[in-house]
UniProtKB/Swiss-Prot annotation:
Similarity comment text for this entry: Belongs to the ATP phosphoribosyltransferase family. Long subfamily.
GO molecular function list: ATP binding; ATP phosphoribosyltransferase activity; magnesium ion binding
Gene: hisG
InterPro entries: ATP-PRT_HisG_long, ATP_PRibTrfase_cat, ATP_PRibTrfase_HisG, HisG_C, N-reg_PII-like_a/b, N-reg_PII/ATP_PRibTrfase_C
PANTHER family: ATP PHOSPHORIBOSYLTRANSFERASE (PTHR21403:SF10), ATP PHOSPHORIBOSYLTRANSFERASE ATP-PRTASE (PTHR21403)
EC nos: 2.4.2.17
Name assigned to this protein: ATP phosphoribosyltransferase
Catalytic activity: 1-(5-phospho-beta-D-ribosyl)-ATP + diphosphate = 5-phospho-alpha-D-ribose 1-diphosphate + ATP
Cofactor: Mg(2+)
GO cellular component: cytoplasm
Pathway membership: Amino-acid biosynthesis; L-histidine biosynthesis; L-histidine from 5-phospho-alpha-D-ribose 1-diphosphate: step 1/9
C-alpha cells in the first residue's frame, strides 16, 4: 500500500511525525527522495506536493493520501475522507484592502478576485450570487489588490496576521480546512487502510490524556473512585499480602493537577502520571 504524503512545507513534518507515532517508522524520512519505506514491508510512502496528492489517490498511484481539505475540494477529486488528523487548521477567506469600499461578498460583484483556488472561489461566488472575474495566480495573492490586479482575494489564512501585515481584512469565510486522511473509494475497505485508520485514531484519542497509577488503602477505595471519573472507570488490582489496592485510570490532562491533589487528600500514595502514546477505544 502506498501513502501519499506532503513532500515539503508546513504539512510535511507533522505528517511524518504522526506516521511515526502511529507505529509506522519511516526509513530515511529526512532525505530528499520520492519514496520511503516503512517498518511494514507492505506500506510505502510517496512524497508529493500537497496540491497533487488528491490526483495521486484518485488515479490509484496511492491508496490513501494525507493532505488538506482545501486541496481536495479544489481538485474536484471524488475521495473518501477517513480521518480528520487535526493539524494544519486554516480558513480560506475572502479578503480585501482594509481601507477600501468592500465589506461584504455582494460588494465584489462586477469586480475581480485573485486566488490560487479558482474552483472553490467560483463555487463560492455562485453560492452567493456574485458575478465577478476570477484572476488565477500561483503565489503572492496578497499583493494583487495593491497593484490593481484584483479588487479582492480568496486565500488561506491561519491567524490573519499575514493579511493584516499586507493591509487586508477578512470579509467572509469561504471554508474551513485541516489536514485529513483520504482514500480512493475502492480502497476504503482494504485491511491495511483499516489498520492505518485505527492507528491514527489511537494517536488522536491519546492527545490530551494521561495515565494515572497509584496505591490506595482498601478502605479508601470508594473515596478514590469519587475523585477519578476517568475513561471507563478505574482499573483496581489487589496488592498481594497487603490491605492495599493498585488503581489505574485514564484522565484528561487538564484535570491532572486538581486530581492529584485530591487523591493525596483521600489517602492515595505512589501516584505516577505518564503520557499515553496511543489509545485504542
Amino acid at each position: 500500500m502506498r501513502i501519499a504524503v506532503p513532500n515539503k512545507g508546513r504539512l510535511h513534518d507533522p505528517s511524518v511525525t504522526l506516521l511515526e507515532r502511529a507505529g509506522l517508522h519511516v526509513e530515511g524520512a529526512a532525505e530528499r527522495k520520492l519514496y520511503a519505506d516503512t517498518v511494514d514491508p507492505d506500506v510505502r510512502l510517496l512524497f508529493a506536493r500537497a496540491a497533487d496528492i488528491p490526483q495521486y489517490v484518485r488515479d490509484g498511484a496511492a491508496a490513501v493520501g494525507i493532505t488538506g481539505r482545501d486541496q481536495v475540494i479544489e481538485s474536484g477529486c471524488d475521495l473518501i475522507e477517513l480521518v480528520d488528523l487535526e493539524f494544519g487548521r486554516c480558513q480560506l477567506v475572502l479578503a480585501a484592502p482594509e481601507d477600501g469600499a468592500l465589506s461584504s461578498p455582494a460588494d465584489v460583484a462586477g469586480g475581480s478576485v485573485a486566488t490560487e483556488f479558482p474552483r472553490v472561489t467560483r463555487q463560492y461566488l455562485k453560492d452567493n450570487a456574485v458575478d465577478a472575474e476570477i484572476v488565477e495566480v500561483t503565489g503572492a495573492t496578497e499583493l494583487t489588490p495593491h497593484v490593481e490586479m484584483a479588487d479582492a482575494i480568496v486565500d488561506i489564512t491561519s491567524t490573519g496576521t499575514t493579511l493584516r501585515m499586507n493591509g487586508l481584512t477578512v470579509i467572509d469565510e469561504v471554508l474551513e480546512s485541516s489536514v485529513r486522511l483520504y482514500a480512493h473509494p475502492e480502497r476504503v475497505d482494504d485491511s491495511k487502510v483499516e489498520q492505518l485508520v485505527t492507528a491514527f485514531n489511537s494517536v488522536l484519542a491519546a492527545e490530551g490524556k494521561r495515565y494515572l497509577m497509584m496505591n490506595a488503602p482498601q478502605d479508601r477505595l470508594d473515596a478514590v473512585r469519587e475523585v477519578i471519573p476517568g475513561l471507563g472507570g478505574p482499573t483496581v488490582m489487589d496488592v498481594a499480602g497487603e490491605d492495599t489496592v493498585a488503581v489505574h485510570v485514564v484522565v484528561d490532562e487538564r484535570d491532572v493537577f486538581e486530581i492529584v491533589s485530591k487523591l493525596k487528600t483521600v489517602g492515595a500514595s505512589g501516584i505516577l502520571v505518564t503520557e499515553i502514546e496511543r489509545l485504542v477505544e
